[in-house]
Regions:
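ASCE RecA-like P-loop NTPase motor cores
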Residues: 1-371
Length: 371
């Protein structure tokens, strides 16, 4: 589907010339272009016209949630028939894990997750992996922070169609592998599903509608989209794609391999600390990581599991974590709003995060892979 810009206004003044110059620059593969304009001069409208003409999936990057929300609202109005998504940090409150050597103070990670923002983040990644080209994602600098491997996200995506031969229990297991939870008591809760006889209701993690799958023996008889409030059927579907309920999804094979690699690196790091005369750090690291490994084996996750993302992603040492940018196709457009503020902020946030994690590694709280 192509971008369809909807507006009662037409480009005026310097806007037509700016739009033409930007579009020509993009088609000529100019890597960086800057659009200058005072507040209220219609820069967002100008960019919307460029997006419509270029027709590529677009990331609009802002330096805080408030501005990102404003841009999201504007682009949503400009492109009501296209996929406009919102991707910001889903924490209402976040205190990262840290260690202050000067006062010998260890600070535990503490956070509060906003489930509505998590739903919007999942909607953004799902739209990008759907194969659509008419996707705009408005994001804060949260887009550079680690999330799951898009390859694994795709692997546990479930595709169903009417008439498909599949045992109901096999389908339920695939939902669990996609991190949906069975809950027979909840009226409506994102990321859950319930079963009544041959009917399975799926409360999508990234959408407000319910998907109802009705089985006849070992065949899908019908797929329906249901309004979550009125429970009225909105439409009958011939096929549907169910995306995972969490961005941090992985496979059983990766978990098994990750545990092995964590234990190998733990042995090396403990040996290193002992060789340089740091028995306290060696003991601390061994106890913490061993506990985390046992948790991962038992329940599939642990507190601070993001520190082990390199093992679960199958990445080489020194490579960056997967982030929102990896969910975009190779050829996409990036628009940085107020770049004189946003670009330095990205550098500063990366620097601060690395400094914090370096302390945790040096004092035996985390493995070097956390960096």
């Amino acid at each position: 589907m192509k971008f369809q810009l909807t507006s009662q206004y037409k480009p005026t003044g310097d806007q037509p010339e700016a739009i033409k110059a930007l579009v020509e620059g993009l088609r000529s593969n100019v890597p960086y272009q800057t659009l200058l304009g005072v507040t209220g001069s219609g820069k967002t409208f100008t960019v919307a016209n460029v997006i419509e003409q270029i027709g590529k999936p677009t990331l609009v990057l802002s330096h805080n949630k408030t501005l990102a929300a404003q841009l999201y609202s504007e682009f949503k109005n400009f492109f009501p028939h296209n996929s406009v998504e919102y991707y910001v940090s889903y924490y209402d409150y976040y205190q990262p894990e840290a260690y202050l050597p000067s006062s010998n103070t260890y600070i535990e990670k503490d956070l509060a997750v906003n489930m509505e923002l998590e739903k919007l983040r999942l909607a953004a990644t799902s739209a990008l992996l759907s194969g659509r080209n008419d996707v705009i994602v408005v994001s804060s600098v949260s887009c550079i922070y680690g999330i799951g491997n898009p390859e694994d996200f795709n692997k546990v995506t479930i595709e169903i169609k009417v008439g498909q031969k599949i045992d109901r229990d096999v389908f339920l297991r695939s939902l669990v592998e996609s991190l949906y939870s069975r809950n027979e008591t909840s009226e409506y809760d994102h990321g859950n599903f319930r079963v009544k006889g041959d009917t399975v209701d799926i409360f999508l993690a990234y959408d407000d509608n319910i998907i109802r799958v009705i089985f006849w023996d070992d065949e899908i008889e019908s797929i329906e989209s249901i309004d979550s409030v009125s429970l009225v059927m909105l439409e009958r579907l011939e096929s549907f794609r169910i995306y995972p309920a969490n961005l941090f999804v992985t496979t059983k094979e990766r978990i098994f391999r990750a545990v092995e690699e964590i234990q190998i690196d733990l042995g090396k790091q403990v040996e290193f600390f002992q060789s340089i005369g740091k028995p306290l750090e060696a003991k601390r690291l061994y106890e913490r990581v061993t506990y985390d490994v046992e948790m991962i084996k038992e329940v599939g996750y642990c507190s601070g599991i993001e520190n082990y993302s390199r093992y679960f992603d199958g990445r080489q040492p020194g490579t960056r974590p997967f982030c929102l940018l990896d969910f975009f196709p190779e050829d996409y457009l990036m628009v940085i709003d107020e770049s004189h503020v946003t670009v330095p902020q990205i550098r500063a946030m990366y620097g601060g995060d690395r400094s914090r994690k370096t302390n945790l590694v040096e004092y035996g709280f985390r493995l070097p892979a956390a960096i």
